[in-house]
């Protein structure tokens, strides 16, 4: 359990204004009460659990009741020990009651019955997840915490009332800070703009989870934060999305982005959201290189090529066309081609190739046992003899082998005839182009095919684990039968609860719990009830298949900006998504940029319009009178030193200089890795070297619009 003896707050030096007692004194007091209640509850539960374990076991119903109580106490104790003060997600303040209501992963009261934490799943907690500036649901403000190793390392306040900003300035989140900056002198135009922002965001957050919702918006429109709030709200409001129904998967473009997501989306423990990049979905993703040949990348980006995986697997699922004599210790049995075909048909539809082997093998043994007409041999002895028949095993393994996904996909790139058979629509030149010397020199473009192959094949170790598991179960049942025999012998009437242990269902449930296979499930394999995809304009048709395979319900929140697509995006969202396999598509647009100053957007807009004349560039409504600065690369360090000295808070980013090393307050990124992130100061190094055509223009546009305060462009010439 996390420590409860220290202050809940551990704010870094640059967030010193947030440590003002006027902002956090009430929290400190409340967290002290939570800590005291947690320690008391844990001590009481531990004592009760010890007492139950030491109490006489009893017999019959008494024994069962005792076991149930031990199970209940253990579960509650485990839940409380799993977290410390970070049980608390945040608090909300009602417009008509200044007393904060703290929302937690679990409900918690003190010894007097005073509520310390409101369970996040209760109806009373809905405003914490559902309130927006357009529909505050009766809230005056909401505070979210960022927990790091059990202590608060940052927090943000959202203020929903026009007179509630006083005293919150140091802790306001971006949108609340923007609204506060407008002050009381809002023009009619600004009031209209603000109303548009609030109404659009509210509609997106509250839109139902059925089908695909596209949130289209340019830089600074708040689309990512809106999507994150939507995730939290859907998880709260839609019971179909709980983790026992599949849960929510949030897919981001890269790891720096996922770190940002962790700051915004509240962690909801077991009911939470899985976050990942596309690379994380495939074991080979971490080491995969970028495909250097654009034509190879284009061919592999097609969803059509992913379909080649099915015939590639079926190639290894052909029953023998010749019969064979199977020799046993008792007699010879003829196994005909028709018998092989019947066994192969026994695989249940949808069963992965490697996992279907057991079904086919069992059917094959059944056919052979049925054809044996010698009554002298028992089925068990005959079965053991068949299992030792090397020729039978060899023929079966050749007809339906265990296959690794990496071997299957690697063969496509090194055996031209195999690729031609599986993808007959490819031309001879295209087949030749896709061949390579190293079968498993994986690139990012290979990942969708590896993913599809792994799903279609299943785990090659699954059959082995399953056989070991069955052997363990048999041994456990045999041991349990001996125990039951002893219990019945000691039971006076031989009836009641003890004899119930003879029941197969009860034995199965008890044995399954004690001998479950020791494998960690793939948390990203799905299926998921809902998937959120950010920077979705970058996904290829093949990459979309990776996500569709994980979401049978086709329930998506799709966040993106066509103008930021590095490889171009000339069609509409509707056309793109229908082509990859989605239907029931709704589009929501965010057109107002309330974060990026007009001065920066004025410089960035011509850059993207030169390559994409119809780019959807958002309207920037904020000016800070700081012009875009141009200079020489030699000025980089002096510019950063001057900015750091003048700004105690904030983060800067240098984009385009791989030799610059990241520091505590200055990041160093490529244009591609800066996507989706924001910084107070952005310094571009030789942006003209970012590339040519649409890709270069998009990289320059994205890099320029990462700045929320100041943009500096430095060149070598």
Enumerate the predicted regions with their spans.
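Extended, charged low-complexity regulatory segments
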Residues: 1-194, 199-202
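P-loop NTPase Walker
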Residues: 2-45, 52, 167, 173, ...
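Conserved helicase motor core of SF1/SF2 NTP-dependent helicases
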Residues: 240-241, 246, 255-300, 456-457, ...
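Conserved hydrophobic/aromatic pocket- or pore-lining residues that grip, position, or stack substrates
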Residues: 197, 453, 536
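Conserved helicase NTPase catalytic core signature
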Residues: 336-530, 539-544
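Conserved ATP-dependent motor core of P-loop NTPases, especially the RecA-like helicase ATPase domain
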Residues: 208-211, 217, 239, 243-249, ...
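Active-site-adjacent beta-strand anchor residues
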Residues: 250-251, 386, 443, 590, ...
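A residue-level signal for conserved active-site and pocket-lining positions in enzyme catalytic cores
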Residues: 92, 309, 453, 600, ...
């Amino acid at each position: 359990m996390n420590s409860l003896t220290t202050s809940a707050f551990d704010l870094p030096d640059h967030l010193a204004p947030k440590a003002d007692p006027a902002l956090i004194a009430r929290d400190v007091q409340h967290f002290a009460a939570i800590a005291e209640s947690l320690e008391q509850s844990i001590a009481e539960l531990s004592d009760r659990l010890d007492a139950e374990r030491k109490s006489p076991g009893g017999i019959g119903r008494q024994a069962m009741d005792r076991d149930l109580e031990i199970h209940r106490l253990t579960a509650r104790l485990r839940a409380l020990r799993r977290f410390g003060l970070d049980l608390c997600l945040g608090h909300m303040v009602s417009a008509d009651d200044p007393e904060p209501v703290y929302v937690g992963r679990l409900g918690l009261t003190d010894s007097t019955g005073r509520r310390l934490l409101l369970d996040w799943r209760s109806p009373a907690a809905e405003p914490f997840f559902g309130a927006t500036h357009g529909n505050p649901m009766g809230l005056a403000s909401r505070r979210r915490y960022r927990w790091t190793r059990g202590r608060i390392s940052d927090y943000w306040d959202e203020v929903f009332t026009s007179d509630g900003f006083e005293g919150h300035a140091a802790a306001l989140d971006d949108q609340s800070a923007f609204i506060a900056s407008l002050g009381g002198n809002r023009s009619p135009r600004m009031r209209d703009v603000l109303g548009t922002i609030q109404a659009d965001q509210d509609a997106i957050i509250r839109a139902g989870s059925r089908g695909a919702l596209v949130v289209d918006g340019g830089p600074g429109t708040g689309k990512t934060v809106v999507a994150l709030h939507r995730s939290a709200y859907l998880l709260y409001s839609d019971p179909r999305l709980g983790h026992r129904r599949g849960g929510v998967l949030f897919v981001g473009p890269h790891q720096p982005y996922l770190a940002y997501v962790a700051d915004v989306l509240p962690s909801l423990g077991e009911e939470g959201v899985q976050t990942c990049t596309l690379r994380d979905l495939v074991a080979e993703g971490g080491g995969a290189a970028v495909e250097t040949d654009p034509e190879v990348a284009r061919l592999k980006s097609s969803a059509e090529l992913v379909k080649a995986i099915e015939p590639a697997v079926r190639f290894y699922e052909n029953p023998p066309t010749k019969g064979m004599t199977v020799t046993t210790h008792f007699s010879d049995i003829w196994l005909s081609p028709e018998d092989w075909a019947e066994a192969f048909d026994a695989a249940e539809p949808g069963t992965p190739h490697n996992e279907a082997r057991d079904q086919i093998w069992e059917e094959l043994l059944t056919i052979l046992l049925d054809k044996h007409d010698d009554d002298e041999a028992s089925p068990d002895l005959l079965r053991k003899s068949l299992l030792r028949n090397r020729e039978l095993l060899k023929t079966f393994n050749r007809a339906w082998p265990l296959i690794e996904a990496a071997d299957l996909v690697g063969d496509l790139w090194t055996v031209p005839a195999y690729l031609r058979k599986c993808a007959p629509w490819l031309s001879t030149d295209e087949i030749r182009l896709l061949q390579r010397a190293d079968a498993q020199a994986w690139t990012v473009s290979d990942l969708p095919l590896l993913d599809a192959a792994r799903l279609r094949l299943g785990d090659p170790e699954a059959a082995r684990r399953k056989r070991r598991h069955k052997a363990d179960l048999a041994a456990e049942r045999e041991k349990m039968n001996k125990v039951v025999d002893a219990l019945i012998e000691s039971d006076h009437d031989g009836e009641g609860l003890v004899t119930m242990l003879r029941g197969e269902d009860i034995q199965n449930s008890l044995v399954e719990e004690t001998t479950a296979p020791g494998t960690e499930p793939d948390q990203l394999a799905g299926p998921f009830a809902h998937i959120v995809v950010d920077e979705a304009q970058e996904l290829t048709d093949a990459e979309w298949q990776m996500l569709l395979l994980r979401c049978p319900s086709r329930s998506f929140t799709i966040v993106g900006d066509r103008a930021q697509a590095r490889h171009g995006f000339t069609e509409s969202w509707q056309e793109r998504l229908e082509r990859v396999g989605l239907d029931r598509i709704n589009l929501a647009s965010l057109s107002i940029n309330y974060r990026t100053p007009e001065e920066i957007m004025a410089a960035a807009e011509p850059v993207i319009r030169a390559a994409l004349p119809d780019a959807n560039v958002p309207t920037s409504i904020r000016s800070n009178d700081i012009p875009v600065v141009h200079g020489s690369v030699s000025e980089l360090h002096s510019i950063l030193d001057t900015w750091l000295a003048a700004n105690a808070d904030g983060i800067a980013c240098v984009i385009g200089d791989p030799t610059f090393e990241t520091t505590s307050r200055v990041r160093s990124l490529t244009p591609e890795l800066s996507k989706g992130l924001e910084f107070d100061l952005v310094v571009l190094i030789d942006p003209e070297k970012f590339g040519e055509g649409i890709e270069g223009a998009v990289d320059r546009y994205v890099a320029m619009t990462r700045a929320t305060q100041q943009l500096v462009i430095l060149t070598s010439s």
